[in-house]
């Protein structure tokens, strides 16, 4: 138990040396997308002719294809939409990478909040904020660095306006010690 605690403290120390605008990975560490291991859900799935393409799990399939009709994007329906991944365990998260829809409606994501925490109260919307998506071009993939490493099991993307939320990939980035 003490060894695990010491390793965790070293991880936090190494991660905290990252600047929020840095894409560098500290020596001796590897970055991994842990969202691929998770389970996704969303506030409400799009209904109608193209509903089959709209599943929450499409945003964690490892495919950054930004064309909604290719079946690799999620799509909510209704106001104040949210999408969430349960990572199934707690991690120290440094950043979240999002791929925006590219074939249409890229502006809809503006104002979305990326929230990370250990609680599901209010569907994770009450968890601390990592970053806000101010603007993203259609089809763009962008990494949002948390101001400091954040500990959490749930990553929620919440769009607090009257608009649907469309995500073509969500990657939750965690640093692990590199194998020797």
From Swiss-Prot:
Would you indicate the residue range of the signal peptide? 1-22
So where does Ca(2+) get bound?
A: 58, 61, 63, 72, 168-169
Here the disulfide bonds are 73-168, 104-105, 130-146
Q: Which residues bind alpha-L-fucose?
A: 75, 101, 108
State the source organism's domain of life: Eukaryota
Statement: the UniProt record of this protein carries the keyword Magnesium: no
Q: Which GO terms describe its biological process?
A: regulation of cellular defense response; regulation of complement activation, lectin pathway; regulation of innate immune response
For this chain, the family text in UniProt reads:
Belongs to the fucolectin family.
Which PANTHER family does the annotation name? Answer: FTP DOMAIN-CONTAINING PROTEIN, SI:CH211-215K15.4
What is this protein's record name? Fucolectin-3
Please name the source species.
Anguilla japonica (Japanese eel)
């Amino acid at each position: 138990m003490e060894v695990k605690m010491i390793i965790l403290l070293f991880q936090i120390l190494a991660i905290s040396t990252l600047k929020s605008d840095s894409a560098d990975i500290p020596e001796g560490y590897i970055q991994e997308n842990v969202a691929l291991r998770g389970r996704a859900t969303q506030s409400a799935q799009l209904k109608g002719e193209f509903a089959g393409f709209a599943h929450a799990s499409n945003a964690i399939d490892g495919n950054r294809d930004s064309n909604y009709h290719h079946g690799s994007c999620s799509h909510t329906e209704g106001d104040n939409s949210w999408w969430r991944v349960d990572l199934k365990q707690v991690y120290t998260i440094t950043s979240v990478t999002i791929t925006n829809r590219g074939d249409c409606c890229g502006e809809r994501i503006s104002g979305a909040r990326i929230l990370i925490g250990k609680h599901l109260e209010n569907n994770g919307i009450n968890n601390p904020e990592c970053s806000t998506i101010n603007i993203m071009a259609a089809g763009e993939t962008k990494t949002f660095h948390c101001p400091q490493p954040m500990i959490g099991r749930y990553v929620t993307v919440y769009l607090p306006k009257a608009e649907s939320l469309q995500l073509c990939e969500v990657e939750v980035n965690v640093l692990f010690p590199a194998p020797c």
